[in-house]
Amino acid sequence: MDPKGWCEKLNDGHVIPVLGFGTYAPEEVPKSRTVEVTKLAIDAGFRHIDSAYSYNNEKEVGQAIRSKIEDGTVKREDIFYTSKLWLTFLRPELVRPALEKSLTNLQLDYVDLYIIHFPIALKPGEELFPEDEHGKLIFDTVDLCATWEAMEKCKDAGLAKSIGVSNFNRRQLEMILNKPGLKYKPVCNQVECHPYLNQSKLLDFCKSKDIVLVAYGALGTQRLKRWLAPNSPVLLEDPVLCAMAKKYKRTPALIALRYLLQRGVVVLAKSYNEKRIKENMQVFEFQLTSEDMKDLDGLNRNHRFLPLQIAVDHPEYPFADEY
């Protein structure tokens, strides 16, 4: 088996490649660069591409995917593409139009995975972050079970092959799983996960329910002032990680990615650097010993780089619970 084709089976029968390419970039990165790097990622062997409506780059990501289909590098069915339902579209009647908007931007007929970006509903409208005159977010009240039913309809309509969630805690997952008349379980929960926040309890819970945990921020996140928790350490400068990188003759980033893969986590690697995009594919070329895995477990400090502090007062703010 080609290790680059390493996949996890989802609870609905579809499969997800365990290494994905994250496409999020700060606003100052020119959009044309997104097209370039997404093409580079596909050329390097990435088959799982992760984006979102709110990244404001689905036109470019779609263009890159289509050009790689047109030049014969891949077929559409070789690519696993994820999009996300933004917080201003959580009302059930807005779910399908939001997905259709993403599909129009992408110029694709379907997405492989559509996930609820956060369990936090914001006031519907054009603004991604609707604020009142005091600069506070304007929340909306939506029953997430009703949102989920609308997601199920998108799957039935063939607009999304699989449906899942992101940034949900255990209680919120259980709310969906215990919903009367549930038709499809979420296939995944995409959350921040790395050696400093290893999510061991949430991971065990997800595994027990046959839900795949997908890790974003696996390399410690881009250090964007607006979102970064204050006094955040730099993950890839961690001495244990760096010592291990020397031992295996790999980069600290590869050690961090491999650690998650060996725990059964699907990992998103985000990079706009050509050399590192290619380098990240080497994660399939080596294995960490169980002793080294234990040492990496010891790095956990429950540090969340992206606490979404601006929504802390929302009744469904997910990070107040232990997990």
Curated annotation (Swiss-Prot):
> At what residues does the UniProt record annotate the site feature described as Lowers pKa of active site Tyr?
K84
The protein's assembly and partners: Monomer.
Q: GO molecular function: any one?
A: aldose reductase (NADPH) activity
What GO terms describe the biological role, i.e. biological process, of this protein? daunorubicin metabolic process; doxorubicin metabolic process; progesterone metabolic process; prostaglandin metabolic process
Detail which positions bind NADP(+): 20-24, 50, 166-167, 190, 216-222, 270-280
Ranges in coiled-coil conformation:
none
Q: What is the lineage of its organism?
A: Eukaryota, Metazoa, Chordata, Craniata, Vertebrata
> What does the tissue specificity note say?
Detected in endometrium surface epithelium (at protein level). Detected in endometrium.
What protein am I looking at?
Answer: Aldo-keto reductase family 1 member C23-like protein
Per the UniProt record, which EC number(s) apply here? 1.1.1.-
EC top class, as a word = oxidoreductase
**Organism (species):** Equus caballus
